[in-house]
Amino acid sequence: MTPTAPTAAPPRPPESGAPRRPDLRPQFFLGLEDSSLVATDTLLQIKDTVVDTVESRAMSVIYGDAGLGKSFGTRATIQEMNPDLILPLDFARSRPGPKDLREELFHQMNLSCKMPGTPTAFDKLLRETLPRRPYVIVCDEAQQYRRENFEFLRKLWDTCDPKPAVLFVGGREAYETLQSDPALASRIYIRLEILAMTEDEVLKAVPDSHPVWRGVDEALLKRVDTQYALGSFREWAKVTKHVIKGMEHLGADKVDDRVVDWALKRC
């Protein structure tokens, strides 16, 4: 059986006076109750990449199509690290610029000085501060980054000694931007492409991911994956939610073709 970990805990309110920190715990899509974190090959590959990058103080990229578990796996891995060393560059607005990155790093490190007023002074402060601790800069949704953001982080990484670890996590656009610039591409330590689950992986992982699928006939799992989910963790979460509602609606005590038909019509 594929090993599992406890379900993700609900978010906790921040302590009074604490610096603003995004909740970096892995969140199950749609808040699907009774879900379990499954140690799939994808999750283990992400863990190896993150740990190796952090230990090497390198820059790496984890990329692939949406819904395959890139962010979830990265968040699950960094939960085992000192949260004070994780610097997440998460933005509500799309297409952030270098100014946004500078200011977010300033806030995430909880610096007590006044925020510098010019890029030159700001970069000097960051070059002086980042080497003091083994920080890990996590750039999720990196496909939204402008090219100058990647260049800013590359120059910052180049000029820090010791260097921070930098993880780019995002869609293929992020990977393509990094690869299109020799100065950036030559500095990437690990390139990990995340692919959809194979049929064999689906048959192992899905029954362990949620109790509603335990004991379900393999042919039915294959049907759901072929007709809808296509190896995507996110799509499996959606169909699971609909299956649970379908069982309630139809008064069924197990997942069968009738429940699956009802669920797939809603997906």
List each language-model region with its residue ranges.
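Pre-Walker A (Motif I) flank of P-loop NTPase domains
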Residues: 55-60
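Conserved NTP-binding/hydrolysis module of P-loop NTPases
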Residues: 26-27, 31, 96-115
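Short regulatory helix/loop adjacent to the ATP-binding pocket of P-loop NTPases
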Residues: 78, 174-189
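Conserved catalytic segments around the Walker B and adjacent sensor/switch elements
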Residues: 81-94
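C-terminal alpha-helical "lid" subdomain
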Residues: 1-39, 48, 67, 72-79, ...
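Pre-Walker A adenine-sensing motif
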Residues: 41-54
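Conserved P-loop NTPase "ATPase switch" module shared by AAA+ and STAND
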Residues: 126-149
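Conserved AAA+ ATPase "SRH/arginine-finger" region at the nucleotide-binding site
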Residues: 91-92, 189-202
